[in-house]
Design a protein with these regions (language model features):
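Alpha/beta-hydrolase fold catalytic core
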Residues: 1-21, 42-44, 82-83, 107, ...
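Short gly/ser/thr-rich secondary-structure transition/capping motifs
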Residues: 2-7, 29, 165-172
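Conserved HGGG/HGGXW glycine-rich cap/lid loop of the alpha/beta-hydrolase fold
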Residues: 11-56
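Conserved alpha/beta-hydrolase "nucleophile elbow" surrounding the catalytic nucleophile
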Residues: 25-27, 85, 89-94
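Conserved catalytic-core motifs of eukaryotic protein kinase domains, centered on the activation segment
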Residues: 33-35, 57-63, 121-122
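Active-site loop/oxyanion-hole signature of alpha/beta-hydrolase fold enzymes
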Residues: 47-88
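Flexible "cap/lid" loop of the alpha/beta hydrolase fold
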Residues: 95-138
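Conserved alpha/beta-hydrolase catalytic His-Asp/Glu region
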Residues: 120-127, 132-176
């Protein structure tokens, strides 16, 4: 289905006459991460989405905010004639679910290990060294090498666009 100009992959199964359970995966995951869980609820309608940039869904062409993901989800659910779903989100998917629930009616919301505010983390020694080295003339050329050995696995595995989106999401605080 085309949503916000992107091909979005999803599966929709189970009892379509019952409340829809909408499953949203975490960063770097896809439908398969939630499929086993969704299969336990076949008495309900089950919708599992490959979020844009993951699985078989198209990658955004611009940096998407959490609001963009919420708008995409809302448009998808409207096209599927789903009102007041139960949203189950893991990590990144839970963050999207949290913001969705502040804008639209949901029957229930289940968030699993979902960040809702910017994490204040003490920088590791490696990160401090990288930041310092970037300021030293002649060492900037080592930045690419250093990032390969310092960044998170999710960051390393992401495309350039998804890295920008990841930074946007990590810094997005929805606690207010």
């Amino acid at each position: 289905m085309i949503i916000k100009g992107l091909a979005i992959n999803y599966i929709d199964y189970g009892n379509k006459n019952k409340t829809a359970l909408v499953f949203l995966h975490g960063w770097g995951q896809n439908i398969q991460m939630m499929k086993g869980l969704g299969d336990q609820f076949l008495d309900n309608r089950v919708v599992i989405v490959d979020l844009p940039g993951f699985g078989a869904s198209e990658e955004p062409k611009t940096v998407w905010t959490v609001d963009d993901y919420v708008d995409m989800l809302h448009e998808l659910l409207q096209k599927l004639n789903i009102d007041c779903p139960i949203i189950i989100g893991h990590s990144f998917g839970g963050k999207i679910g949290l913001l969705y629930a502040t804008k639209y009616k949901v029957k229930k919301l289940v968030c699993l290990a979902s960040p809702y505010k910017k994490q204040v983390v003490q920088l590791s020694l490696k990160t401090k060294l990288l930041k310092t080295a970037k300021k030293v003339p002649g060492l900037k050329k080592l930045e690419g090498f250093a990032k390969k050995h310092i960044g998170s696995t999710d960051y390393k595995n992401a495309s350039e666009m998804m890295r920008k989106i990841m930074v946007e999401h990590v810094n997005y605080d929805i606690s207010n």
